[in-house]
């Protein structure tokens, strides 16, 4: 039950990093 909150936080963090990486690649391109 303690791990119910971790997946969403990790997923949002991953997504946020992924979006930043995409924006950086698009800006660099």
UniProtKB/Swiss-Prot annotation:
Keywords: Photosynthesis, Photosystem I. The keyword Phosphoprotein does not apply. One of its GO terms (cellular component) is photosystem I. It holds the Pfam family PsaX. InterPro entries: PSI_PsaX (IPR012986), PSI_PsaX_sf (IPR036243). GO terms for biological process: photosynthesis. Belongs to the PsaX family. This is Photosystem I 4.8 kDa protein. It comes from Thermostichus vulcanus.
């Amino acid at each position: 039950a303690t791990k119910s909150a971790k997946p969403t936080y990790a997923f949002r963090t991953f997504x946020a990093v992924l979006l930043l990486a995409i924006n950086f690649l698009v800006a660099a391109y």
